[in-house]
């Protein structure tokens, strides 16, 4: 999911990185300026990053129902599938790293063999919420996803092993799997949860990756923007590039589209405004009202309509 093609690397190094240098972000909108406006939180609240960046409900009434009225709901099928697929991608990447360290480069074929076996444990925590038919369908998609990702990892590793005779395990992991998945972040400086988790991040060229099993939405760029601000607040180095990875299944195939962009002043300002508006709604208990049109998979739709 996070391994770039030659064309994408060219776009990144020849386009976005030079633009990031020539179009600098305002200091006041860097995460390390969390202690002063406009980044300084205006209310003593903590929001999850999803609560800030989510605009599926155009008025944000889902957040009002959850945080002000205390309405509880269960995850629906698209939410469950998304959670399972995210866990699967993270699992195959961490498993590949672990196997390289455990088995070593001299017996890489054994690591490759063991990595070829899909891990279905991510389904177990949702088993009581799914029918047998749904379980089998999701299991097949997990298999396709696991095989897609593990094959790409092994190909990258074998290419490196063939060209670098003095490679060690640590170097192989770094160069063939150059991402950190589910990195834990503390967003407290910015009025966000202390238990954030970013889908993937690359340190060599700081890029925030956000994986979506969804169609493109105009607000999807807000999530990497929020993570970039948090990382800047924690580590005090600039994070200027985001990438939303759109994945979908077509039979036994995975289709991918990666949307790269600068995390510029406009995106940062939009994120801060969204955070402040939602904090105010919760703090002052302001009902934003129902949207003109509800999205089909909203888990709060019955409570929202009073049914």
Predicted regions span which residues?
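Metal-dependent nuclease catalytic regions and adjoining charged, substrate-binding loops involved
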Residues: 1, 175-194, 233-307
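Metal-dependent nuclease catalytic cores that hydrolyze phosphodiester bonds in DNA/RNA
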Residues: 1-197
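Conserved catalytic cores of phosphodiester-cleaving nucleases, focusing on short active-site segments
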Residues: 59, 85-86, 181, 196-215, ...
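A generic structural signal for residues located within well-ordered alpha-helices
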Residues: 80, 219-222
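A broadly structural signal marking compact, well-ordered functional cores
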Residues: 101, 105, 111-112, 116-124, ...
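Short, surface-exposed loop and linker segments with low hydrophobicity and enrichment for Pro/Ser/Thr
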Residues: 135-138, 214-218, 238
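Structural signature of nuclease core domains in nucleic-acid processing machines
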Residues: 202-215, 220, 234, 257-266
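An active-site-proximal "capping" alpha-helix that borders the catalytic cofactor pocket
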Residues: 222-233
């Amino acid at each position: 999911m996070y391994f770039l093609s030659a064309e994408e690397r060219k776009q990144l190094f020849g386009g976005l990185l030079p633009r990031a240098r020539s179009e600098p972000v305002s200091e006041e909108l860097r995460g390390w300026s969390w202690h002063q406006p406009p980044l300084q939180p205006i209310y003593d609240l903590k929001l999850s990053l999803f609560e800030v960046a989510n605009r599926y409900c155009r008025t944000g009434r889902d957040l009002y129902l959850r945080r002000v009225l205390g309405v509880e709901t269960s995850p629906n099928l698209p939410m469950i599938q998304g959670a399972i697929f995210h866990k699967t991608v993270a699992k195959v990447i961490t498993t590949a790293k672990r196997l390289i360290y455990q088995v070593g480069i001299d017996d890489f074929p054994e690591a490759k063999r063991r990595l070829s076996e899909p891990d279905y444990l991510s389904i177990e925590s949702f088993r009581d919420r799914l029918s047998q038919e749904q379980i089998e369908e999701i299991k097949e998609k997990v298999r396709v996803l696991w095989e897609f990702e593990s094959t790409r990892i092994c190909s990258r590793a074998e290419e490196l092993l063939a060209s670098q005779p003095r490679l060690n395990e640590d170097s192989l992991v770094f160069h063939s799997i150059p991402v950190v998945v589910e990195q834990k972040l503390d967003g407290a400086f910015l009025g966000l949860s202390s238990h954030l988790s970013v889908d993937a991040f690359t340190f060599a060229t700081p890029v925030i990756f956000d994986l979506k099993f969804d169609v493109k939405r105009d607000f999807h760029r807000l999530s990497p923007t929020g993570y970039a601000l948090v990382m800047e607040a924690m580590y005090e180095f600039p994070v200027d590039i985001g990438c939303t990875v759109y994945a979908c299944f077509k039979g036994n195939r995975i289709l991918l589209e990666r949307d790269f962009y600068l995390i510029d002043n406009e995106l940062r300002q939009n994120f801060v405004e969204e955070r402040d508006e939602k904090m105010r709604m919760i703090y002052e208990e302001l009902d934003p009202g129902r949207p003109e049109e509800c999205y089909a998979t909203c888990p709060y739709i019955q409570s929202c309509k009073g049914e």
